[in-house]
Amino acid sequence: MHMNRREFLQLLAVAAASGMALDSKSALAGKAPATFYDVPRHGNVSFLHFTDCHAQLTPVWFREPNVNLGVGGSYGKAPHLVGQHLLKQFGIKPGSAEAHAFTYLDFTEAARVYGKVGGFAHLKTLVDKMRAQRPGALLLDGGDTWQGSATSLWTNAQDMVDACIALGVNVMTSHWEAMFGADRMMEIINNDFKKTGMDFVAQNVVTNDFGDQVFKPYVMKEMNGVKVAILGQAFPYTPIANPRYHVPDWSFGIRDDSMQKWVDEARAKGAEAVILLSHNGMDVDLKLATRVTGIDAIFGGHTHDGVPQPVNVKNAKGITLVTNAGSNGKFLGVMDFDVRGGKVQSYKYRLLPVFSNLLPADPAMDAYIKKVRAPYEAKLSEKLAITDDFLYRRGNFNGTWDQLIVDALMEVKGADAAFSPGFRWG
């Protein structure tokens, strides 16, 4: 992609207007401190959360959006904050490691310092570090995990299933998992998960004929003498956003009434902390938190929002914390509760970026990833093209990756217009 002088000057003007630093060295403060991943334990109940990794076993380059407009009352509020506005809202120092993780600012220069993000071998190292400090901590997978890479397609999701087992996932919900088909989903849940004690929860998926629960709506666990309940919420619009023929006998939806029923039941059974593992998307979770009471925290996904701190949402009986943990294995949420007297007294939360340059790869996970990818290495390493421009795919309206796709469609097909639907989330 080549630019003439006028286009280059226009790009500079856009960059300046959007707050993009043209001198990256002026804004990049330096590497993260050695204590970056030191997160002292708080309280007696801990949850670790990742979501929407989209089958990315290896580290990736990932730039956060420079445009993320909220609609109506959501305008100018989390998760619809980018760049300097996000830094100001959450008190993050410009040029810091967190600034690189949560914003697009100085992306190219900072990426050279911190490296790629995510990768299950690096995520495994971080998960193990957090668990070593938090006896009994539960690892939650928010879904969109099995789908999104060539190897997940070629192995019928088995590469990701085995990786999640090795990672130590305790509880999972779903969205794109359904695209492997209902039979394959049930095969994995009833065999692979059952053998390892992993739970799959989704309170909002029922049969079309009699409305019976397809999956467990929630599970009860005990952590350091404290009973906790984890409810599941699969993506409510799966048969609309994805081909219905993959799950022809299942009905989805938000189903906040049934969710309230399950929350109340879990509380009646002695749950002192109740959390929701959700794939609604953050805006839906924020609304849901006003309607359903008794949930201490929502660990959200789907919209790929890396939000540094929870949003406190008031409802008729208290407050629910709403979080969202980004995508592509880039973040690990760490929520610590102090539970006493039958309820959550206080909490501390960190959304930790998984920087491949700062976290060593776990040897066993690294070996597994190399092994599972080895049969396909020739295909995976094939060079398709070389770009002379910066390609990214995050923003409400467009990105350079989307532009490349639609330009190609118009050139090859001779079309007057072309559209790229939703690629920004991938």
Predicted features and spans:
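Acidic, metal/ion-coordinating pockets
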Residues: 3-13, 19-356, 364, 396-408
